[in-house]
Amino acid sequence: MKIKLVTVCAFFSFGLTALAQIQGDGGMPKSKTIQPAAVKTVLFQEPDVAALRAEDLINDAEKTGPWRFGYNNDTWMNMENSGEWYELTNGGKIWMIKLQCKNAYTVNLTFENLVIPKGNELYVYNEDKSFILGKFTGNHVYEGQLGTELVPGEVAIVEYYVAPQNTAIPVSLSIDKVTHGYRTASEYIEKGLNTSGNCNMNVNCPDGAAWGDQKRGAVMLVSGSNGFCS
């Protein structure tokens, strides 16, 4: 069995707050005249958070895997069976879908079968566009896959823009996972010292002597769409 692992790398400042480096090349979504309230919504009900946290107490103590922050809703939404297309006055078009995870702290997504020809753009953002990931281009896609950073709040809107010159070119996008964040990055950072798993190496020990420059920074990885490693 071939197992695909989508890993997202996010950089954090370890202070009172955790600030993620925003993914993408910058830019603004093209849906200026489309109100978020009008976009078709797919609602995911809240998972059993109490049961998940009870499992986390055991997993965190044993340190046998990533620190789980979210619940993965496995899905197979794509441009054919979900969302809606909008025509633009410039001759281009946009595919949009709104994903809502009830009572989530964050929402992050895993894309499969993603094709972004030159000139097309992908964005993921929250409902008031105060947090925007993108633009994503073909340069951000690896073997048809892309995992996003965590969008704050319980809503993530996906917008795929097709440039006018590309309307005859086939495009593809599937949403494989919609992750409901029930724990936060702040909880992970505040878990304290001496809590690393047995797969980690302490850079302040002799084994880490060769990593003197790197230890001044910190990297947080999103593993399996719903866990943190650092």
Report the location of each language-model feature.
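Bacterial Sec-dependent N-terminal signal peptides
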Residues: M1-D25
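Domain-level representation of secreted and single-pass membrane ectodomains enriched
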Residues: Q21-S230
